[in-house]
Regions:
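Flexible propeptides and autoinhibitory/regulatory segments associated with cysteine proteases
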Residues: 7-75
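Active-site nucleophile-adjacent alpha helix/oxyanion-hole segment immediately C-terminal to the catalytic cysteine
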Residues: 46-146, 157-165
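Acidic, Ser/Thr-rich intrinsically disordered and amphipathic helical segments
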Residues: 5, 19, 36, 40, ...
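Non-catalytic membrane-recruitment/adaptor modules and adjacent regulatory linkers
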Residues: 10, 147-154, 159-170, 244-256
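Active-site-adjacent substructure of cysteine-protease-like catalytic cores
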Residues: 161, 166-238
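Generic preference for well-ordered alpha-helical elements
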Residues: 81-88, 102, 153, 157, ...
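Noncatalytic regulatory segments and standalone regulatory/sensor domains
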Residues: 3-11, 15-24, 32, 231-256
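Short coil/turn segments at secondary-structure boundaries
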Residues: 79, 92-93, 172-173, 224-227, ...
Length: 256
């Protein structure tokens, strides 16, 4: 399944009426699905990806979070939060501090879903000392204010900031029509070719951070890239794993 198919699959998903999603559903313990650890991921990399000139995040620090992991029912709406978990677990693992923090879905969602916390992080990031918040933040953008509880890349950046990690928000070609985040918070608009070039440079680093791509409906994580004379290959961690599907199917490559 490629990115377009995934977006198409979920574009028709809607709720019958708007509401504030402030609760999450706990699954029964016997239905729990555990995130894939680094050993499993290294095995998948070896079996699935035989590219030459393959560059990726360090699999020793990768974990794969996907729908309904940790006994939380987030099927059809939680891919953005799972993407955040993938990034955070990677960055904290590099610092050997993953066990010092609770980055479970439930904790992240309940802590970073509400406006006050996110506004305070925005003020910190922009060195705002008073309450002169830009007007563009008056629109609903927080997960508790939206229909589906989805976390835009803007939310991801603020969460990373709270863990003392930096991030950059880029638009590829245009502002996504389904985004809750204000257009003003993005740093730069680039085309796809520029995006590929940036990824090539980015993944030259042995411990390069995975990259979230998020259109306001579906969130995926790019963990590697291979560029040859004719094609570009992205290694994808896709949290949008169907309920009865093997979670390993959420790790694949797309050829462009």
């Amino acid at each position: 399944m490629d990115i377009n198919e995934i977006s198409s699959h979920f574009s028709n998903f809607s709720l019958t009426k708007p509401y504030l999603r402030k609760q999450i559903e706990q699954l029964e313990k016997d239905k729990e699905k555990n995130p894939l650890n680094s050993e499993s991921i290294k095995k998948i990399f070896k079996e699935k990806f035989s590219f030459t000139n393959f560059k990726s995040s360090n699999p020793n620090y990768l974990k794969f979070y996907y729908y309904n992991s940790e006994s939380i029912n987030d099927y059809s709406w939680g891919s953005s939060w799972r993407s955040i978990q993938i990034i955070l677990s990677y960055l904290l693992s590099i610092k050997n501090s993953l066990n010092k923090y609770d980055i479970s879905f439930k904790t992240l969602f309940l802590k970073y879903g509400e406006r006050t916390k996110l506004i305070n992080l925005f003020k910190k990031d922009n060195k705002i000392q008073n309450n002169n918040i830009p007007n563009y933040l008056n629109k609903p953008f927080c997960p508790f204010e939206t229909i589906d509880g989805f976390a835009d890349p803007f939310i991801s950046k603020l969460i990373l900031l709270d863990f003392n990690f930096s991030g950059e928000l880029l638009l590829i070609n245009d502002y996504p029509k389904n985004s809750y985040a204000p257009k003003e918070v993005f740093n730069l608009i680039i085309n796809f070719e520029e995006f590929v070039n940036l990824l090539e440079i980015h993944f030259n680093d042995e411990n390069s951070t995975p990259v979230i791509i998020n259109d306001g409906i579906v969130s995926l994580v790019i963990t590697g890239i291979c560029v040859d004379d004719n094609f570009v290959y992205f290694i994808i961690f896709d949290p949008n794993v169907k309920i009865n599907e093997n979670c390993e199917n959420g790790i694949y490559y797309i050829k462009l």
